[in-house]
C-alpha cells in the first residue's frame, strides 16, 4: 500500500520545504522503506529552464533531460535516487497540456474549468507511477495563501477525501519567529497560517516548526491546542550548522516516528543513521581547509549554484577539509587585475552560465589559473572560456571567440545544431524557441585512456548530464593540442569535445557537462573529490 504525505509551507517562503521533504525521505529510507519524492510548482512557467537564475535559483537537470526545480537536487542528494521529469510539474505545464487537449477537441466541447479539469490533472500527476513505493512525499511550492497555489491545495484536499482512510497525511512547515524585546518565540503567525490552511479544507497532522532556539513546553501546548494537532506532532525544526545535520535533528525530534504513527505503523526499531553521523562528524571536524574562488555571473544569489556548492562540500568531506568559497563576480575582472582577488587561493572554479556579460572576466580567470599553476575547474561555459583563452594565448588566434556573443572570424565555440541522443539525431536552429531546446540530460562520453580525467574517473566510459547550446569547435583541435590543451574526452561519435585538460599543469580540467548534478554526500563526484584534493596540495605550497 502506498501512503501519501503532502508537505506545505506557511508564514514565509524559503523555509526549506525541499530540505524537510528530503530529510524525511532519508529517515524513512533508513527504516527500510521505499520512498518517492515529487514537487508541485505553482508558477506559470512551463519549467524553470528560461527563468533567471537570480530569481529562481539553479535549474536542476535530470538524466532524462528535464529542467526542474532545485529541490529535486536535494531529493537526489539525500536519497541517492535519481529524479525524473515525472517528479516535477508546474501550473504552466498543466495549463499547456489542458489547452492543447482542448484545442484538439479531447474534452468534447465541455467548459474547461479549474475544478475539475486543473485539479484532476494535478491529482493524476500525484498518483501516477507510484507502484512499489511505500511512501510518496509531495512538496507543494510556495506558501499557503498564495493565489497561484490554490488549485494545488484544492487538489491535495480532494485526495485526502478520495484516498482510502489511513493513506494520506499533511505536514505543515512554518516559522516561529523570536522577538528579542519580548524574549520569546511567537506562535501567532503559525496559528494564522494553519487557520488559512484549514479554511481551504486541509487540517495538518504535523507541524514542523522552524526556530532558532528550543520551543518551550508551554508554546508546544499552545500550538497543539490552537492548531488542532497532538502535542507530539509539534516537531521542532531548529537551525543546524549543516544541511546534512537535518535528518539527524528531525530524527531526534521524532518526525519519522510521528509520520509512521499517523499511518498506524509501529516503529519497532530506530532508523539506521550511522552514515549520516559520519558525514556530520566530518563536516564539523575537518582536518584542514582550502579556499576556492567561484568566478561566476549570478553570485548575487547563491541558490543559482546550489548543486555546485554541495558538490564542493562533498569534495571537502572526501578530503576531510573545510571548503571556504570566495565569490567573485566575473565582470570585475573585465576592469581590474585578477591577481589581488585570486592570490593565495587554492583553486579557481568557473561555472556554467549564458551570455556575454562577464565572459572576458572568466577568460582572464582561466588565464591566471593556467599561468600561475593554480588548480582550475571549468564547467560548461567555464570550459568554453578556458578554450577561448588557450586559443588566444597559446595557439596564436587573437580573435578567437564564441558565436554566442555575435559573429566572429574565429568561432572556437559555436552553436550546437545537431547531436546524437542514443541512435536518434536531434537538431536545433538559432531562430528556435529557447525553452527546452538545449542539449539536455545524460549523455555518454569516451575518455582518452592515458588522460588525467580518465585516471580520476577510473575508466574511459562516463555518462554525465548536459545543459548547453554551444560547443567547442573540433576544427581547432589540432592547433590547440599542439599547444598543450588536450581534447581528452569526446562524444561516442567523436564529433563533440566533452572534456579538455592542460598538459603539464597540476590540475586544469574543463568539462562540457555538469558533474555537480550527480554528486552525493555519500558518493562525492570523482572530479570534485580530485579538484579539492589538488587544492589541498596547492594549500601546502602557498
Curated annotation (Swiss-Prot):
EC number: 6.3.4.2
GO biological process terms held by the UniProt record: 'de novo' CTP biosynthetic process; pyrimidine nucleobase biosynthetic process
Catalytic activity: UTP + L-glutamine + ATP + H2O = CTP + L-glutamate + ADP + phosphate + 2 H(+); L-glutamine + H2O = L-glutamate + NH4(+); UTP + NH4(+) + ATP = CTP + ADP + phosphate + 2 H(+)
Region (Amidoligase domain), start-end ranges: 1-265
Binding site for UTP: 13, 186-191, 222
Top enzyme category: ligase
UniProt: Mg(2+) binding residues: 71, 139
CDD domains assigned: CTPS_N (cd03113), GATase1_CTP_Synthase (cd01746)
Keyword Ligase: yes
Residues the record lists as binding L-glutamine: 353, 381-384, 404, 469
Pfam families reported for this sequence: CTP_synth_N, GATase
Keyword terms of this UniProt record: ATP-binding, Glutamine amidotransferase, Ligase, Magnesium, Metal-binding, Nucleotide-binding, Pyrimidine biosynthesis
InterPro entries membership: Class_I_gatase-like, CTP_synthase, CTP_synthase_N, GATASE, GATase1_CTP_Synthase, P-loop_NTPase
Any one GO MF annotation of this record: metal ion binding
Binding residues for ATP: 14-19, 71, 238-240
Ranges where the Glutamine amidotransferase type-1 domain occurs: 291-541
Annotated control of activity: Allosterically activated by GTP, when glutamine is the substrate; GTP has no effect on the reaction when ammonia is the substrate. The allosteric effector GTP functions by stabilizing the protein conformation that binds the tetrahedral intermediate(s) formed during glutamine hydrolysis. Inhibited by the product CTP, via allosteric rather than competitive inhibition.
PROSITE patterns xref list: GATASE_TYPE_1
Pathway annotation from the record: Pyrimidine metabolism; CTP biosynthesis via de novo pathway; CTP from UDP: step 2/2
Classification via SUPFAM superfamilies: Class I glutamine amidotransferase-like, P-loop containing nucleoside triphosphate hydrolases
Record-level GO cellular component terms: cytosol
Residues at the catalytic site: 380 (nucleophile), 514, 516
Family: Belongs to the CTP synthase family.
Subunit description: Homotetramer.
Note: CTPSs have evolved a hybrid strategy for distinguishing between UTP and CTP. The overlapping regions of the product feedback inhibitory and substrate sites recognize a common feature in both compounds, the triphosphate moiety. To differentiate isosteric substrate and product pyrimidine rings, an additional pocket far from the expected kinase/ligase catalytic site, specifically recognizes the cytosine and ribose portions of the product inhibitor.
Name of the protein described by the UniProt record: CTP synthase
Gene that produces this protein: pyrG
Amino acid at each position: 500500500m502506498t501512503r501519501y504525505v503532502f508537505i506545505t509551507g506557511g508564514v514565509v517562503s524559503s523555509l526549506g520545504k525541499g530540505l524537510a521533504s528530503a530529510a524525511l525521505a532519508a529517515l524513512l529510507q533508513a527504516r527500510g522503506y521505499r520512498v518517492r519524492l515529487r514537487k508541485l510548482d505553482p508558477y506559470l512557467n512551463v519549467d524553470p529552464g528560461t527563468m533567471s537564475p537570480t530569481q529562481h535559483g539553479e535549474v536542476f537537470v535530470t538524466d532524462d533531460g528535464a529542467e526542474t526545480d532545485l529541490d529535486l537536487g536535494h531529493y537526489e542528494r539525500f536519497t541517492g535516487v535519481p529524479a525524473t521529469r515525472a517528479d516535477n510539474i508546474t501550473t504552466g505545464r498543466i495549463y499547456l497540456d489542458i489547452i492543447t487537449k482542448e484545442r484538439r477537441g479531447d474534452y468534447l466541447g465541455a467548459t474547461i474549468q479549474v475544478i475539475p479539469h486543473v485539479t484532476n490533472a494535478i491529482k493524476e500527476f500525484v498518483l501516477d507511477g507510484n507502484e512499489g513505493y511505500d511512501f510518496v512525499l509531495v512538496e507543494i511550492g510556495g506558501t499557503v495563501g498564495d493565489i497561484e497555489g490554490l488549485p494545488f491545495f484544492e487538489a491535495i484536499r480532494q485526495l485526502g477525501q478520495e484516498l482510502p482512510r489511513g493513506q494520506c497525511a499533511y505536514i505543515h512547515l512554518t516559522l516561529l519567529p523570536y522577538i528579542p524585546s519580548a524574549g520569546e518565540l511567537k506562535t501567532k503567525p503559525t496559528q494564522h497560517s494553519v487557520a488559512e490552511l484549514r479554511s481551504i479544507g486541509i487540517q495538518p497532522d504535523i507541524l514542523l516548526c522552524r526556530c532558532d532556539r528550543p520551543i518551550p513546553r508551554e508554546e508546544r501546548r499552545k500550538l497543539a491546542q490552537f492548531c488542532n494537532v497532538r502535542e507530539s506532532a509539534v516537531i521542532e525544526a531548529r537551525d543546524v550548522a549543516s544541511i546534512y545535520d537535518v535528518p539527524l535533528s528531525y530524527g531526534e525530534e521524532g518526525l519519522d516516528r510521528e509520520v509512521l504513527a499517523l499511518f498506524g505503523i509501529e516503529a519497532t526499531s530506530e532508523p539506521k543513521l550511522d552514515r549520516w553521523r559520519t558525514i556530520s562528524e566530518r563536516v564539523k571536524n575537518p582536518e584542514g581547509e582550502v579556499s576556492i574562488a567561484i568566478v561566476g555571473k549570478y553570485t548575487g544569489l547563491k541558490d543559482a549554484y546550489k548543486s555546485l556548492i554541495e558538490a564542493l562540500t562533498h569534495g571537502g568531506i572526501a578530503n576531510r577539509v573545510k571548503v571556504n568559497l570566495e565569490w567573485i563576480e566575473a565582470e570585475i575582472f573585465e576592469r581590474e587585475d585578477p591577481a589581488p582577488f585570486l592570490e593565495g587561493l587554492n583553486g579557481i572554479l568557473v561555472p556554467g552560465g549564458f551570455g556575454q556579460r562577464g565572459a572576458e572576466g572568466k577568460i582572464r580567470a582561466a588565464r591566471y589559473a593556467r599561468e600561475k599553476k593554480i588548480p582550475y575547474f571549468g564547467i560548461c561555459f567555464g570550459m568554453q572560456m578556458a578554450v577561448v583563452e588557450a586559443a588566444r594565448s597559446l595557439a596564436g588566434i587573437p580573435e578567437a571567440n564564441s558565436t554566442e556573443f555575435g559573429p566572429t572570424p574565429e568561432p572556437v565555440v559555436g552553436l550546437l545544431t545537431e547531436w546524437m541522443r542514443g541512435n536518434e539525431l536531434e537538431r536545433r536552429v538559432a531562430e528556435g524557441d529557447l525553452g527546452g531546446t538545449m542539449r539536455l540530460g545524460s549523455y555518454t562520453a569516451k575518455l582518452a585512456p592515458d588522460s588525467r580525467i580518465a585516471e580520476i574517473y577510473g575508466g574511459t566510459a562516463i555518462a554525465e548530464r548536459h545543459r548547453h547550446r554551444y560547443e567547442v569547435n573540433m576544427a581547432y583541435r589540432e592547433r590547440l593540442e599542439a599547444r598543450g590543451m588536450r581534447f581528452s574526452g569526446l562524444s561516442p561519435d567523436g564529433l563533440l569535445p566533452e572534456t579538455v585538460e592542460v598538459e603539464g599543469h597540476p590540475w586544469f580540467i574543463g568539462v562540457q557537462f555538469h558533474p555537480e548534478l550527480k554528486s552525493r554526500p555519500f558518493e562525492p563526484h570523482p572530479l570534485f573529490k580530485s579538484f579539492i584534493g589538488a587544492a589541498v596540495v596547492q594549500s601546502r605550497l602557498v
